[in-house]
Amino acid sequence: MRLYSAKVPPIAQEVVRVLLSSKDIDLEDAGAQKEVVADVESVLRSYLETERVVDDKTRDLLERTGRGANEFGKVREQLAEHHGIKVGDESLDFILDQVVAMLMHSSHVEEVYAEDVVLRRHMAPIFKKHMGADSDVDVEVRAQLKHLKEGTAAWDIEYARTLDNVKRRRGLG
């Protein structure tokens, strides 16, 4: 699962809408909803920016040290921890924690009525739906490459090209 910048506004709007409709949070006034959406977007954009920095530093470090791309995940995880974020399977939990903390401290949220666990339970499906775009994209790309044998150089090249096309078409680029 991966968070895409194009998905930030829909996620933020849906999270705030769901939390308001389930009466988990109460806002200071009707106009504050836009501000809370902007606060959620800010949390998500901050995560994306830090993740981008971690990815860039990981690539640089692997290049400088001559280590293989097979160590990317391990090095990325260590650098992410150094930068104070979680990546990979733990990213969803980390992002949910950040959004809950923001809701607790936001001046636009008058009251948080639900426990942290309930907030997370209401937000998680929204994030999973939008962050699961990766697996949908992968299924679509693989369906278009049935004529090639997986693992061959031609398959790798076509997979990358088709993946770019599908992501661009879906606005995930």
Label for each model-derived stretch:
Residues 28-33, 112-115, 137:
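Short, tandemly repeated low-complexity microdomains enriched for cysteine and small residues
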Residues 18-22, 61-64, 78-85, 102-106, ...:
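Conserved, well-folded catalytic cores of nucleic-acid-processing
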Residues 2-73:
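N-terminal interaction modules that seed assembly of large macromolecular complexes
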Residues 41-47, 67-130:
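Conserved mixed alpha/beta catalytic, RNA-binding, or beta-rich assembly cores of soluble enzyme
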Residues 3-12, 19, 23, 79, ...:
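FKBP-type peptidyl-prolyl cis-trans isomerases
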Residues 133-173:
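Alpha-helical oligomerization segments
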Residues 7, 11, 54, 71, ...:
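Residue-level detector of well-ordered alpha-helical segments, enriched
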Residues 14, 77, 98-101, 125, ...:
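Short, residue-level hotspots on alpha-helical faces of the histone-fold
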